[in-house]
């Protein structure tokens, strides 16, 4: 929305259909050093509702990719305002990533008794650091959840990104694409178990 002089009033101005019919909406945020990124998330969610995004596209599943810095209440807005049913934490075994993942899990726990989104599990996005699997498993156990998927670190992801495409589009027969398909099925199964999709 930052590219617009004024807030866009049409969904088509902030959305784009990508590979495989996936609808992508990039809302951006405030100018660096100015404004509140958490407020940007709130504004984005309100804009999706105002423009009728959910009614127009009737998505099977909605994924929000938000920063892991949940000390700001705005970053927890999708789960607090009923926009999310499950929270999946994507982390590597790097110490700062584990710390951010723990903060997200704590935020979900803090809201547990209010009927907000539940912690659905952890996804390991490998960076090939020492004790990576053990640290991520410990994180899952600390918050009484499970590791629902494990992704290999692959340069193919970066290669596809450099081409402005998804890995599935550039390398559909790769081992990484297979890992993504398996993870997608695991996420759908998690939703089906709770009658969410």
Where do the protein language model's features map onto the residues?
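Conserved catalytic-core segment of NTP-binding enzymes
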Residues: 50-61, 66-150, 159
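Alpha-helical scaffold segments in soluble metabolic enzymes
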Residues: 43-50, 103, 138, 182, ...
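C-terminal boundary of histidine-terminating zinc-finger modules
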Residues: 163-174
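Nucleotide-state-sensitive switch-loop elements of NTP-binding domains
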Residues: 1-66, 70-71, 83-86
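Helical mechanochemical/support elements of P-loop NTPase systems and associated helical scaffolds
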Residues: 36-40, 71, 96-100, 104, ...
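A short acidic, often aromatic-flanked loop/helix-cap motif at beta-alpha or helix-coil junctions
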Residues: 30-32, 154-159
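Short, hydrophobic alpha-helical segments
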Residues: 184-195
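The feature captures the short pre-catalytic strand/loop hairpin that immediately precedes
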Residues: 24, 160-162
